[in-house]
Swiss-Prot record:
The E7 terminal domain is an intrinsically disordered domain, whose flexibility and conformational transitions confer target adaptability to the oncoprotein. It allows adaptation to a variety of protein targets and exposes the PEST degradation sequence that regulates its turnover in the cell. GO terms for molecular function: DNA binding; DNA-binding transcription factor activity; protein domain specific binding; zinc ion binding. This is Protein E7. A zinc finger (unnamed) spans 59-95. Its main location: host cell. It comes from Human papillomavirus 35. It is found in: Host cytoplasm; Host nucleus. It comes from the Viruses. The keyword Metal-binding applies.
Length: 99
């Protein structure tokens, strides 16, 4: 650009398209490797669907509020709920030191 006022001639308009390499350099893995990836577990069963659950309960000794985050299946979290509603209790770190 020359001067204070820009004109169309100041811009380069004679751009040429560049050649682009369209060759794909991706390497595919063997079909035997793919089969190994699809097998989950020793019996070839798929892993169960798990989720994170936040549990708020109280210490069975001092009644302090305890917060836990666990990863479990829906069925197993129901089993834990049954345990917590029964005689199963969780002890806070302070009470575990005193025991």
């Amino acid at each position: 650009m020359h001067g204070e006022i820009t004109t169309l001639q100041d811009y380069v308009l004679d751009l040429e398209p560049e050649a682009t390499d369209l060759y794909c350099y991706e390497q595919l893995c063997d079909s035997s490797e793919e089969e190994e990836d699809t097998i989950d577990g020793p019996a070839g069963q798929a892993k169960p669907d798990t989720s994170n659950y936040n549990i708020v309960t109280s210490c069975c000794k001092c009644e302090a509020t305890l917060r836990l985050c666990v990863q479990s299946t829906h069925i197993d979290i129901r089993k834990l709920e049954d345990l917590l509603m029964g005689t199963f209790g969780i002890v806070c770190p302070g009470c575990s030191q005193r025991a």
